């Protein structure tokens, strides 16, 4: 029967009360949903948009934010790399604006040419505490290639890795030298050639010249450069690294310092005719020919006269070192014999051939890198938005799945915890409810008192106990206690029960604490790195025993009397009668046991030092220390899914607890 009748519900006051109640409930729902939306939104962000708070990611609807995230991802989250390639300052990713329309002809020619450019590095392959698409795909390709055997990968690719989570793509070559010719580098380059051309970062020596020399020397204000050189450039984008050294003295000095000391040697070439100076350099660098041969076993010679002058970057690292040191020698290596040949020069030749005009008529051309990046972004908006939305979740799932035993360990741990909790706690509560010993409330008080101490207080004592667990004394003492109870109940029936229990307990303590250690010599065993170490500390729960005891007390005693008349055993009464009528409270117990086992990470980390026994929560805890804030949010969302599913499964059973007393 409703509290308010249908007639009463027609009045304005009652409707106003109803409306107020629903409004308050709606506010409560919003207050819960909005923080959830903030966390879900934060789980699909990166460094670019992590500062934007809102219930949805802005790059879903704003092309500007999408372009910022695309540039961040492509340039491996290194602002310096993007600035050097773009040839202009960026500052932060959030300051990037949509580029203005430039020369469409140059852009189309650049897009047609860039697949032929030999100077590039794969973008979206690495990042600071984030794993972009190509980095994740590279790891997956190697995982499939070696069937998940990290040792085989380390051996065949000559790249030692202890675990798959430590495997990352090699970083872009820094400073002057390229990567050495190693199997792991070759594997990455082979993978890079399978990725889309739009993911390639085209090297830009002009941008390097601005970023690594002009700005440190003349600040980022181009007017300072203009005053020093007598020029009228509007920006550093108009300052190019010429193929040959300029005539103007200060520009020539800038060119010399940058090319000799900073520019990667892959862009530097020497004119023929420096054989004698180069041989003199080697004779001064190496005391004897034998010393040279020892350092250059791949190119042993009888005398320095047999050494050829390198015209470009050599292949071996020792030859590259000689090449760099020779470049720095201003006496033996004149500036007139050095020239630069890089992507811009090749692009200019491509444009000249395509337009059938002399190269001199179009040089210098500023490569439209920014416009090309924007074109690539706008041409793949749907795929990019999906990738940015899912990549953090893919990163977390890859991290979990690459630790093959993490899921298995968690599943075993949760099953053991729930199963044993559904066995131990109901048995204890049934004994207190069914037999009602005089010490019932003392036992309940002792169980409830354990809740006064936080779990962190017992971590160290539990660790010490599990490290030196008295397994054999417990078995011996328990067996002695059981035998003593049976013997005393058989031969001393007239003795009070409390006295018999006390005597049996004393016998068990004597056997367990003294006799067994004396006989075995080593009574302790270590339970660390076992499932027993995870399950035993939470095997019995005082609060659940108290809760179950109260629920069992509500079961009518007439049911047990009827079972006694039918000749039911105590186990039958417990299992078929008590447990079958207690499914709602058992669902609460199972949900609590699962939540406690699934979410445990600190205790699991303490008692399980072996990584092979770690659970998912321990791995996610480790992931959060090395990952971006958005990845942490994604890991929390994924970690909450199993608990949510278990709660949904148990919810219907728990709700039956409202009507079960009526049924009984």
Name these PLM-found stretches:
Residues 54-387:
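Polysaccharide-binding and catalytic clefts of secreted carbohydrate-active enzymes
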